[in-house]
Design a protein with these regions (language model features):
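Non-catalytic all-alpha helical scaffold/repeat segments
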Residues: 1-110
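Residue at a conserved register position within TPR or TPR-like alpha-solenoid repeats
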Residues: 139-140, 157
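Short amphipathic alpha-helical heptad-repeat segments
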Residues: 121-133
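Short, charged, amphipathic alpha-helical segments
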Residues: 146-156
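Amphipathic alpha-helical coiled-coil segments
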Residues: 157-171
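Short, charge/polar-rich alpha-helical segments
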Residues: 111-124
Length: 173
């Protein structure tokens, strides 16, 4: 890594990002197993290797998208408690706040997709905004950092909902 924090291996970073972007089963936190130690060990190893080879930024970006594949927690709220613990423990690390969290929000939005029904007063985005806002309130005490992330996700859906409503008003009223 050079003094600017950018990877020296830009071409390889992009390839590494593409490889990580295709993985959707989180070690230690998936529908088959929930093992915090396995997850923590895996993520530590990934970060160590990324740092060693100068891929920190690319890996941080990719990890955000990757962790957005988390299953719901035992309480039915996304993300799983293991991922929530990761956010609570690492939220103030620059790689998490600058790269990982924004890509987590975008990644979750992207694989849920937009479901727009033109000319309809209700839409998927509005429903999702309400869901994530309610979930953020429910976990706020135990997982304040994750609650903040869910609020960002809710805000993203709220913005999309308003954009859809504006188009609806313009073209379907």
């Amino acid at each position: 890594m050079d003094d600017s924090g950018e990877s020296k291996n830009n071409g390889n970073s992009i390839s590494f990002y593409k490889i990580l972007d295709r993985i959707t089963i989180i070690p230690g936190c998936n529908k088959y197993t929930a093992d915090k130690e396995a997850f923590d060990s895996w993520i530590t190893n990934v970060r160590t290797i990324a740092k060693e080879y100068g891929y920190e930024k690319a890996v941080s970006l990719s990890l955000g998208t990757f962790l957005s594949h988390s299953p719901n927690g035992e309480d039915g709220i996304f993300p799983h408690e293991i991922i929530r613990d990761f956010f609570e423990e690492n939220a103030y690390e620059s790689y998490v706040s600058e790269y990982l969290i924004p890509n987590f929000v975008v990644g979750k939005s992207n694989h849920e997709g937009a479901k727009v029904f033109w000319g309809s007063s209700s839409n998927h985005e509005k429903h999702m905004a309400e869901k994530y806002n309610n979930d953020a309130k429910i976990i706020k005490i135990d997982y304040p950092e994750t609650s903040s992330i869910l609020k960002r996700l809710s805000d993203s859906y709220e913005w999309s909902s308003k954009a859809v409503s504006s188009i609806d008003e313009r073209y379907f009223d």
